[in-house]
Amino acid sequence: MPASTITVFFATNRNPIGDPPTDFGPLLGPIDGTAIRFGTAEIDEKTLKLRKLEVAPEKLVFDDPTDKTLVLGSQQVFDALKAKMIDHARDTLIYVHGFGYSFTEALVRAAEFKKWLAVQMNIFVFTWPSDGKMVPLMSYPKDRADVERSGDAMARAIEIAARYLQKIATDDRCEQRLNILAHSMGNYALRYGVQGLLRRYHSTLPRLFDKVILAAADEDADTFEFDAKLKPLAQLAQQVLVYHTPRDRALIVSDLTKGNPDRLGAGGPDNTRSLNDKVSVVDVSEALSGDDDATNHQYYRVNTRVRADLRQVFGDIVPFQVKGRLYLP
């Protein structure tokens, strides 16, 4: 594709629209949301509009007994992703979006983040069936329920990626790394993805990620204290970073109006002294002016100081040496 587009790889457990699919909707897909479709999208770099969507063909059911050729969409997409990782020596970032995104909006937001972050990496989106409506008291409970039911699908998408990479011959295996960034309710999705992996691997989780970024997390503040939440995340990653601010108005609403416990993305994690050494906590309050985002919930992509911080993180600067931070041991 021309240089004027941004390639976004995706996996989704949303309901497909059309056969073959030309879009995906706000509902759980086949097999109670456990079936996953893979594909790629091209987003116009200037206008940030979807220019092209390709859903990888998938054939798991044999209508013709004489033709039992298995077609896996994941194989096609990961072949393309692997080629980019090797040819361009780029890491890959898996992005998990938050509440209120349609399928297309999730793809565009991922491309926008890659453009604004200005780090050379591949972008891969896991897009769960958020309904694309910002109606908190109506859409929020539905999205939250769908997140819980999407955990196995997310775990399967991660497992498929890991299994595929493990099959690559040693001399072909690329040295580039996988990172993950979850925003807002995407952190709740990540919790259930981690639990899905636990059911598969039991207590011995594989190291799948280099860095995991939890931004403005709509997740419980005690999440690192329980195996049933995100405590096992440290086993999956080399480094876990929590970005938070008590000034996050969206999470204040989540806390006060929806009966949720204290939010990780607002006050940060409970009991920071007992955190795994891999977990770093970054309070972004001093970087916020309110001019970029009135809710103080989208700072990971719109705030220049936070983006500069993330660029250093992806550039392998260790936490206590990141410029612009006041380090509190």
Task: Annotate each PLM feature.
Residues 1-66, 85-87, 107-111, 117-122, ...:
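Lipolytic serine-hydrolase domain surface
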Residues 66-68, 72:
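Active-site- or binding-pocket-proximal scaffold segments within functional domains
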Residues 72-86:
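A short, well-structured juxtamembrane/interface segment
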Residues 91:
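Alpha/beta-hydrolase fold active-site loops
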Residues 94-98, 183-184, 216:
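The conserved beta1-alpha1 loop
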Residues 98-99, 128:
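Beta-hairpin (beta-strand-turn-beta-strand) motif
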Residues 101-106:
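Short substrate-entry loop that stabilizes the transition state in hydrolases
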Residues 154, 182-186, 190:
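Gly/Ala-rich beta-loop-alpha elbow adjacent to hydrolase catalytic centers
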